[in-house]
Structure formats: C-alpha cells, structure tokens
C-alpha cells in the first residue's frame, strides 16, 4: 500500500521517525556526549529509517558541517560487487589517516550499505581492517539481516535494531511514501 502525502506531512513523518526511535536517538547521543563512539550496525527491515537515523547521527558528530562530512565520511554500497580488492585497497587507504573535529573526536567514518553482500573473504579482510584502523576510523553498517555477516564482525560492533515505526496502528515504511505533486 502506498501513501501519497504532501511535503508538510512528509516532514512530520521524518520528525516522527526521530520521535518514535527516541531510545535509539538517546543511546546515540550518549555516545557523542561521552566521546566514545563504537562501530555500529544498524539493522532492521527496509524502510525503517536506518539510513535516516545514521545520517542524523553523523551530522551531530561532525557538527552539520557538510564539507567535513564530504571529506571524512566514506559511503560504500556493497551491493555493487565490492570484493576483497576494494577492502584491501580503497577502504584501507581511506581509513589510514586520522582527523580531529571540533568535538575532539578523532576519527573518519566509513558507512557500509548491504555489507551482507560481501564475500566471506571480503568480510574477513573488513574485520582485519576494522581491527587495524579502529583508532582512526569508525565503521557503520546498515543491513537488514545480521545473519549475513560473519560472527567476528558482529562481535566488534554495537548492534542497534531499528524497527518499522508504527503510526496509528499501522507499520509505516519510508519506501511506501510518495510525495504529492502540487
């Protein structure tokens, strides 16, 4: 079922995502306050707001500075044939350097979408990369099913489940919302 909504309603739903997931947002804010941000896996059904919540989290970490985010956050969609060579070369090269932002947090961020599509060898290389560069880089994974990841990767991450929000006794997915053309 698709919902056709106007721009004001879509903004309300976007704010509702943050309202519904307050316990998750509070946990993420706690990490920022303590300046102790772990590697995090956001998992849950498609359309639950995982990407939205992560982007808000990264904006808070980097003080909404789009230039810093562009320079120090790497987004990777693993559904596009990313293998062990990509992990060993490009991802490792990005992770090598460190930074300091205004909050005193010393790290770059790598966001991996659909990491379950990585081969077993690529996931093993990712695990080694996480171990080697955890002092300069934080890894964030967005995935629907954590069973697709190797257990050694799961054990190095804080796992946060993002359920579909329920609004008016209906589960609402962002994928089922279309903007009303005015």
What is each PLM-predicted segment?
Residues 1-182:
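P-loop/Walker A NTP-binding region and its immediately flanking N-terminal helices
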């Amino acid at each position: 079922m698709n919902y056709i909504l106007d721009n004001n309603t879509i903004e309300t739903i976007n704010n509702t995502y943050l309202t519904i997931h307050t316990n998750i947002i509070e946990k993420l804010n706690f990490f920022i306050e303590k300046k102790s941000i772990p590697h995090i896996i956001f998992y849950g059904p498609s359309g639950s707001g995982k990407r939205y919540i992560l982007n808000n989290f990264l904006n808070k970490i980097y003080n909404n500075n789009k230039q810093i985010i562009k320079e120090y956050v790497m987004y990777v969609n693993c559904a596009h044939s990313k293998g062990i060579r990509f992990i060993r070369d490009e991802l490792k090269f990005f992770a090598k350097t460190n930074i300091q932002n205004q909050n005193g947090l010393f790290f770059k961020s790598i966001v991996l979408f659909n990491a379950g599509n990585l081969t077993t060898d690529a996931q093993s290389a990712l695990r080694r990369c996480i171990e080697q560069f955890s002092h300069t880089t934080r890894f964030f994974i967005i995935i629907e099913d954590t069973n697709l990841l190797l257990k050694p990767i799961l054990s190095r991450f804080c796992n946060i489940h993002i359920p579909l929000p329920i609004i008016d006794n209906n589960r609402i997915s962002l994928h089922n919302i279309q903007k009303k053309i005015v």
